[in-house]
Amino acid sequence: MHDKYLIADDWGYILGGRNTDNRFLGYYKESYNEDRDLLVYGEKPGQGSSFQALEAYFHEIWNQPCCKEFDAKGGIGGLEQCCERVKERYPEAFDRIYSKEDWEKATMETRGIELWTNPTEPENKEPVVWERMIAAMEGEEDILVQTPYMICSRKMYEDLRSVCEKGARVDIVINAVESGTNPFGCIDYLNQKKKICQTGVHIY
């Protein structure tokens, strides 16, 4: 699985594309890759529809026959020791407990959040997410898509062309090739950039 999310009790969750290693987290190098993370929380703990959907998704993955527990050395004791070392090194990160007002100032209210996923079985999958994306684009004038990489099938090219021909402006934001960490995604974009642009989308 390539999912990256952190559920905090029944309060909220962080969802993003950032890998949990030193290339993406912390300040261990002079420069490191930045990625987008979303903090989502609700007024009523555990009641938001997207929060409930993410929890259900976690249990769906966790309970699949192909999954098994990882036998980590050290157990919870090693994790607690690591936490203490972090507190010693970065005490300022633990000095302040944020209030409800702090969170409200730092965030914005949404009209709703939906989490979509393809089938989770470890086998060839139907492109459920793509079909939902195309359906959501119907009748819209301005469409913004953010994705790390863009590798299209023949049908995806056809779908994008169809959306643009109906008058929609489609802007797609991808990772910079110069700093991308997925060589296959970067190379495919460079090879197919002209073909992508010929569908009518604007890519950045």
Language model features: what each stretch is:
Residues 1-204:
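Charged, low-complexity intrinsically disordered terminal segments
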